[in-house]
């Protein structure tokens, strides 16, 4: 009986090691809570999904500088064991500033600019 438990434990450890070995690059979406109007308060959102492993850095930037008062959702996972997180902050859109989301993951470092037309 003890040998069966040993085999089960070894099998579970192999499965955990296999899941840890999977790397999936994040998908990044940058958008506002409501349609953007210059001079009107809004929220800038960066939704990052489908990444593994869970270690990730997500920053919201205005003209290359980190934005203040950023809030982060809890790190959550999907049925396929990839992770997702929402990062957001209040802001006032205008035509002169560049807003972007910068993501650093072991699979990629990438910045996605907010496109007010999408």
Curated annotation (Swiss-Prot):
Keywords annotated in UniProt: Disulfide bond, Immunity, Immunoglobulin domain, MHC I, Secreted, Signal
Residues of the signal peptide: 1-21
Disulfides per UniProt: 46-101
First-listed, main subcellular location of the protein, grouped into a coarse class: secreted
Family of the protein in this entry: Belongs to the beta-2-microglobulin family.
PANTHER family: BETA-2-MICROGLOBULIN, MHC CLASS II-RELATED
Descriptive protein name: Beta-2-microglobulin
Lineage: Eukaryota, Metazoa, Chordata, Craniata, Vertebrata
Encoding gene, per UniProt annotation: B2M
